Amino acid sequence: MVDTSSVSARLEHLDELVTELDAIRDGGRDGYMAQWRTRLAAEHALQLAIQTCIDVGAHMVSELGLKAPADYRGVFESLCPAGLDARLAERLAAAAGMRNILVHGYLDVDDEAVWAALDRLGDLRDFAAAMQRIGESGRAAPEK
């Protein structure tokens, strides 16, 4: 059985992070590029948002008895049998790669790539909606 209260709390945190990232994006590219603190805030919030998706996804994989992933990127593919859209899973796997750069490759962080990621925040919201739906069902979707 999926611990919906734990998942819901994490998804609420994800929503707060994405809302802040939306506000940064709404400030415009020029302001983003000109302000080191804004870029730093975006990088950190994006890292936390992606990590939250990974954590929720890993929890769901475990609770639903799905195939254990080999790495963070694989968490999203493992959720496809439970009903996560495969195209969304691919985009989220790429986001996990961005998270790795934000965590480990701080000298290699590309401001343009982070800015571009702010245009894909809908993927994080779509993931949250899918996890809410799958969590409420409490079981993996049947294999097709």
Language-model segments: residues:
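Solvent-exposed interaction patches of small proteins and small membrane subunits
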Residues: 1-144
